[in-house]
Structures are given as structure tokens and as C-alpha cells.
Amino acid sequence: MRKMSKRQQEILDYIVAQVKLKGYPPSVREIGEAVGLASSSTVHGHLDRLEKRGLIRRDPTKPRAIEILLDKPEEDHEAIVHIPVIGKVTAGFPITAIENIEEHFPLPAHYVGNENVFMLTIDGESMINAGILDGDRVIVRQQNTAENGEIVVAMTEDSEATVKRFFLEDQQVRLQPENDSMDPMYFDNVSILGKVIGVYRTIH
């Protein structure tokens, strides 16, 4: 039998991760969104191949009836979730960043738990004192509130998104860079898109 394709492995990893996280398998639509496949028929095709390999079993009468049949013990398969990577945030001089999903990035499920998260790529050096460097990917938990001092993704009044440390002072919002050479930004109002809960960095 031919080696399982990368896409089939992604789908299998996602199903395993969702069963571990939620206790039930994802729908075909959710699988497609997680691995970047718009066509449900394409997803069904990959599921057919996984079923022929004896890795899953499906009940065609039910939308979520996918049973995992793995030869290896469950603990040998670390749960993986595919995090959407959304646009790009400039740290320093903000640019419009909330665009369509660019890709999905695999992470161990225990990194994010049951949180609703996304990732953004940092472009700039305004957060270097917080250990967030140019080119890093930050892991962001979606939420619309923040406590003083938390690092957030905020949408400004000019519809620009940026990563900064949040402070509410005298009915005014201060977005504070973590770079001694940069000045704070002040706004009457901002929209909180999420709180930064982690950083992913590739060492070249």
C-alpha cells in the first residue's frame, strides 16, 4: 500500500486531536476548514482512503460518526491541532492585519488546550523586551477584553491591528511597546481581538 499522504496525515491528526479535546469527532466541514480544503467531496475522498487503510471507520448515516482505528496505542499519537494563521501584524508601525486565513499551523494540542486561538506573524521590533521578535508567530486566544499589563492584539480606531501591552488610563487606552526606543500609543477606544498566550519561533 502506498505511503499515506501529508494531507491524509493532517486529517487523521486533526480527527484524533478533536476526539481527545471534545470527546467526539469533527464534521466534514470542520475537517475541511482545519486543513484548508474548501471542497467537501475532497475531504470525503481523503476519508475514504483513511477508511480503506483501516485507520478509521465511518457510519454513512451520521454526520460525525468517525471511529478511530489505530494500530499503535493511543498514547503514541500525540494530539495535534491546526491553528489558523491570520494575516500579519506589524509590531511598531501597525498595518491592517486581520485578513483571510493564510494557512493552518500544526501545534500539540496540550499547548492550547480547549482555547479558541489563532496565530499572527510579527513584523517589527516593538515587542523585543517582552521576548517577541521580528518574524515570531504569536499564539492568540480570542477574547474582547483585557486586563492592564496584558499583551494583546488590538484594532485601533483607524482599523489597524497591532500587538502591544494594554493599559486603560483615565478613560484612554495606552498601547505600550516593549522597546525602549519607541513611544506609547494613545487612543480613545480600541477593540481587543485577543490576548497573546504564547510565541512560536524558528531558529535558523
From Swiss-Prot:
Any GO molecular function: DNA binding
Residue spans binding DNA: 28-48
Sites annotated Cleavage: 91-92
Gene Ontology biological-process entries: DNA repair; DNA replication; negative regulation of DNA-templated transcription; proteolysis; SOS response
Record EC number: 3.4.21.88
Catalysed reactions listed for this entry: Hydrolysis of Ala-|-Gly bond in repressor LexA
Residues at the active site: 126, 164
Enzyme type, top EC level: hydrolase
Keywords, in A-Z order: Autocatalytic cleavage, DNA damage, DNA repair, DNA replication, DNA-binding, Hydrolase, Repressor, SOS response, Transcription, Transcription regulation
Domain of life, per lineage: Bacteria
Pfam families in the cross-refs: LexA_DNA_bind (PF01726), Peptidase_S24 (PF00717)
Family: Belongs to the peptidase S24 family.
Quaternary structure and interacting proteins, as annotated: Homodimer.
Primary role: Represses a number of genes involved in the response to DNA damage (SOS response), including recA and lexA. In the presence of single-stranded DNA, RecA interacts with LexA causing an autocatalytic cleavage which disrupts the DNA-binding part of LexA, leading to derepression of the SOS regulon and eventually DNA repair.
PANTHER family, sorted: LEXA REPRESSOR, LEXA REPRESSOR-RELATED
HAMAP family: LexA
Protein name from the UniProt record: LexA repressor
Species this chain originates from: Exiguobacterium sibiricum (strain DSM 17290 / CCUG 55495 / CIP 109462 / JCM 13490 / 255-15)
Name of the encoding gene: lexA
